Amino acid sequence: MLRAGLRSSRALGLRPNVVSPGRQWRAQNARVISDTMRTFADKSSISDSRPPVLPGSASEATSEPLPPGAVATPNSAAPTPATPTSSTIPAENVPLTPPPPGVQSPGPPPPSSSPPPPAPKPKRRFFRKFFTTLFLLTTLGFGGGVYYSRINDNFHDFFTEYVPFGEDAVLYFEEQEFRKRFPLISSRASRPPRDTGEQVKIPSQSGVSWRVANENKDSTGRHTSSAKDKVKPSEAVQTPHDSKPADRVKAVEQVKSGNSPVKNSPAPPATPESKPSNVQKDPEVNEPSRAYKKIERIDPINIPNGNEPVVQELVKIMNDIIAVVNADNANARFTSTMDKAKAELNRVGAKILDMKDAALKQADEKIKSSDAEFDRAAMQLMQNFKNQQAEQEAQFRAEYEAERKRIHENYEQKLKSELDRANEVNEKTLQNNLTEQALELKRAFLADVKNRVEQEREGRLGKLSELTSTVNDLEKLTGDFNTVVDQNLKTQHLHVAVEAVRANLEKSQIPRPFTRELAALKEIASDDPVVNAAIASINPVAYQKGVPSSAALIDRFRRVASEVRKASLLPEEAGVASHASSYVLSKLLFKKKGLATGDDVESILTRTETFLEEGDLDGAAREMNGLKGWAKTLSKDWLGEVRKVLEVQQALDKPDYKV
C-alpha cells in the first residue's frame, strides 16, 4: 500500500521521490527538473563564462574525480518527455507484493556525495590545566612568600609558623646568604658535636643511702678518709708537666678530633696475683654512700680589653679547646697548659694594646705635625690672599675712577643734548599754541559773521529747520496711530470672537459643539502665544460635544442634590436596609438656607446651591469636592461637567484679560 502511494505521487509530480545512487550521474536517466527552479549546477547568469559545477565536485574537502559521462543541467538540449518515464507504473497495475530485488553486477561502488565526517572535537583537558595552574600558582606564591619573609619580620613569623616547609626554606636561603657574605667562616671545619650520644653511667656508690652515716664509727675511726682506697692521681693520670711538648700537642689534637689518648693507649698487662687498689665494689644495702672528689672544670678565657678581632679569634679557639678538655674530663692534665696559654694570651693582648697605644701616639704626633704644617700653609695663604686683595683693590679703585670720569663726560653730553632738544620742543609748542589761537579766533569770527547773517535774514533758515522737524514728528505720529488702529481692530475682532464663543455657551439650552467659533478665534489670534496656549488647554471633548450652560448645571444640581440627601446617611459599606433607612430619614431632615456652616452633607449642598445662584461655579465645585462616601460618588458626574465648564471659562478669560 505504501509503495503504491509513492508510485502514484511520483507519476503525478513527474519527479521521483527517491533517486537511486546508480542513476545519479547518467544523462539518459537524469531527473526531470522544471525550468523555473535553479539548482546548484545552474549558472547564475547567461553571461557567466564559468562552467557549471555540481555539488561536491569543486569541494576542497574531497579528492574524488568526477564520474564519466555528460552532466545533466536544466538547460540541456534533451527534450523533456510529456509523459512519465517507462519505469513509472500506473497505480492500477501496482502488484500487491513487492518484486524480488534484482541482482546487481559486482563493481566499484558509486562515489558518495555525502560530506566528509566532521573533525573530532578537541578533548577538554580540564584536570591537567587545573593541576598545572594550581602547581604554578602554588610555586609562585611559595617563592614570593619566601622572598617577602626575608624582607618583612611580621610576615616572616607568620610564614614560618603557618605555611608547611616555610621555615626550612627560609632557613636554607638565609644560610646560603650567610655563606655568601662570610666565606671564611663557612669554609671553616665544622665543630664536632658535644653530645656524643653515649649513655651516661652513674657510679653505683653515688647518691644517698638509707643508713645513718655514723653507724660505722667504731670500726673505721673518727678520721677515716672516704677516699683511702683510691689510687693517687700521679698513678692514674699523667700530668702535663711529665709529658713532652710534642705529646701534649698530639693529645690536644686527638681530643679535638674526638679520640681520647687514654682510651687509645694500650692497657698494661694485668697480673693475676695483684688486684688494682682502685677497684670499687658495689655498695651493700646497709653500706653508706661514698663521697668522691669533685672534678674542677677549666674556666673559659676572658681577657680584659680584648676588643681586637685577632685576640677574639684566639680566645674563641682556646675556649673551644677548653670545652673539649672539659668534655673529656682531662682537666688535671691540661690545667697548667691552659693557664700558660691564658697567660700568653693575656701577654699577647697586652702587647697588642701597647702596639695600639703606640700607633695612636704616633698618629697623634703625625696629626699634630700636619696641623702645624696646615696652620703655616694657611697663614701663608692668608698673607698671599691679603696681598692679592690689596693689589686688586688698588686696581679696582683706578678702574672705578676711570669709569666714573667716563660716565661723567657721557652724562654731560647727554644733558647738553637734552637741553637743546627741550628748547627746540618748547619753541615748537609755542608756535603750535599761537597757531591754534589764531584758528580759534578765526572760528569765532566766522560764527559771529554767521549769527549776524542769520539775524539779518530774520531767522529764515531757522524756521525752515523747525518746519522740517515738525513734519517728521507728524509722520511718526501718523505711523504710530496706524499701528494703534490696527491693534485696536485686531483686539476688537478677538473680543468679538470670544463673545461669540461665550454667547454660544450661554444661549444654548443643550450642550452644542463650538468648534467653528473656536477655530475662528484661533485664526484671528494666530500670532498670539497666550491665546493659542489658552485654546490648547481646552479639552477636545468639551468643544467637540459642547458643555452645559449655567441654568442646566443648576437644574441638574437640584436633581443630584435630592439623590445626595437620600444617601447622606449611608455608610461606606451599606446594604439594602441601610439604603432604605437613609431614604426614610432623609425626608425628616431640615433644609438649610444661605451660607450654612458645618461639614455635613446638608450644609455643603446649601452652600453649593448658594454659589450656583450667585454664578460662582468655582466655589460650588470646591464645596462639592469636599463630600465623602456615597455622596461624592453620586455627585461625581456633575463635578466632571462643572470642571469642563470651568476649563472653558478659564480659557476664554485669558484672551479677555489680554484684550
Curated annotation (Swiss-Prot):
<comment type="similarity">
    <text>Belongs to the MICOS complex subunit Mic60 family.</text>
</comment>
<feature type="topological domain" description="Mitochondrial matrix">
    <location>
        <begin position="41"/>
        <end position="129"/>
    </location>
</feature>
<feature type="transit peptide" description="Mitochondrion">
    <location>
        <begin position="1"/>
        <end position="40"/>
    </location>
</feature>
<feature type="compositionally biased region" description="Pro residues">
    <location>
        <begin position="96"/>
        <end position="120"/>
    </location>
</feature>
<protein>
    <recommendedName>
        <fullName>MICOS complex subunit mic60</fullName>
    </recommendedName>
</protein>
<feature type="region of interest" description="Disordered">
    <location>
        <begin position="41"/>
        <end position="123"/>
    </location>
</feature>
<keyword id="KW-0812">Transmembrane</keyword>
<feature type="topological domain" description="Mitochondrial intermembrane">
    <location>
        <begin position="150"/>
        <end position="659"/>
    </location>
</feature>
<keyword id="KW-0175">Coiled coil</keyword>
<keyword id="KW-0496">Mitochondrion</keyword>
<feature type="compositionally biased region" description="Basic and acidic residues">
    <location>
        <begin position="241"/>
        <end position="253"/>
    </location>
</feature>
<feature type="transmembrane region" description="Helical">
    <location>
        <begin position="130"/>
        <end position="149"/>
    </location>
</feature>
<keyword id="KW-0472">Membrane</keyword>
<keyword id="KW-0809">Transit peptide</keyword>
<feature type="coiled-coil region">
    <location>
        <begin position="403"/>
        <end position="458"/>
    </location>
</feature>
<comment type="subunit">
    <text>Component of the mitochondrial contact site and cristae organizing system (MICOS) complex.</text>
</comment>
<feature type="compositionally biased region" description="Low complexity">
    <location>
        <begin position="72"/>
        <end position="91"/>
    </location>
</feature>
<keyword id="KW-0999">Mitochondrion inner membrane</keyword>
<dbReference type="GO" id="GO:0061617">
    <property type="term" value="C:MICOS complex"/>
</dbReference>
<comment type="function">
    <text>Component of the MICOS complex, a large protein complex of the mitochondrial inner membrane that plays crucial roles in the maintenance of crista junctions, inner membrane architecture, and formation of contact sites to the outer membrane. Plays a role in keeping cristae membranes connected to the inner boundary membrane. Also promotes protein import via the mitochondrial intermembrane space assembly (MIA) pathway.</text>
</comment>
<dbReference type="GO" id="GO:0042407">
    <property type="term" value="P:cristae formation"/>
</dbReference>
<dbReference type="InterPro" id="IPR019133">
    <property type="entry name" value="MIC60"/>
</dbReference>
<feature type="region of interest" description="Disordered">
    <location>
        <begin position="187"/>
        <end position="290"/>
    </location>
</feature>
<keyword id="KW-1133">Transmembrane helix</keyword>
<dbReference type="Pfam" id="PF09731">
    <property type="entry name" value="Mitofilin"/>
</dbReference>
<feature type="compositionally biased region" description="Basic and acidic residues">
    <location>
        <begin position="214"/>
        <end position="233"/>
    </location>
</feature>
